[in-house]
Amino acid sequence: RANGKKSLIPAFCDLLNIKYTGSDAFVISLLRNKYVYTKFLEENGITVPRSELFSDKSDLHLLLSQYKDQYVIVKNRYESASIGMTDKNVFRLCQNSLQHLNNLLKEMCTDSLLVQEYIDGIECEVLVLQYKGKYYALDPVQILFKTNLNFIDTDTSNTYNYEFKVIESSIKFLLQATAQKAAELLGVKDYARFDFRIKKGVPYLFDIAGTPYTIYHSSISYLFTQY
């Protein structure tokens, strides 16, 4: 669960002058650190969920000043594919939440958690491609959940218990523009996937996959069956 582990392959390829697809070691490392890229994008005008870090040395009162009596989602700041996520990771933050947060630290085998405001809205994914120096955002694909758990936890991810639908409404243009701008800001090479939650017509960028799945159960695979 160390930061930067997915940068080893591009770093190795660069060292030996081997051609590869995807972003370089720096960008891949950046895209694995949810807190850092979230704050960077926020400073550059991208709408993101409010986000803070929590460790066993954190002061709960600082979190309460931001999120008291609000629902939050708690993630491992470095992991992907919803690793370690369960229904325990979305809850209302209150005075009694300290023990729950400490339990999540242990259960998720990490020393630092990302605490974000929970955006209760539809979830979608946008693939951005880079070609000859320009970025192109493809059609957004909505995640259709099959259970009452309205986010992808580990079990949902492992069993592919969801479906897809291409978003056709006018919000697609804002999603595409936002994903494209984020890719440009981050210096993405070749491709990346940008994940959003939409609430009251506002898309919140909450996750990025620098090496997204393209296998049959992925939104990317589904999207290319629709063209």
Language-model-derived ranges and their functions:
Residues 1-32, 47-50:
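A short, GP-enriched loop/loop-strand-helix hinge that lies immediately N-terminal to
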Residues 42-45, 169-227:
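ATP-dependent carboxylate activation and anion-phosphoryl transfer catalytic cores
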Residues 94-170, 174-177, 198-204:
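Phosphate-binding site of ATP-dependent enzymes
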Residues 28-114:
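Active-site nucleotide/adenylate-binding loops and adjacent lid/helix of ATP-dependent enzymes
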Residues 22-23, 81-83, 162-163, 215-220:
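Short small-residue beta-strand/loop micro-motif enriched in glycine and branched aliphatics
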Residues 6-10, 150-157, 210:
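Short, flexible, mixed-charge acidic loops at enzyme active sites
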Residues 70, 111, 122-124, 189-192:
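Short beta-strand or tight-loop elements
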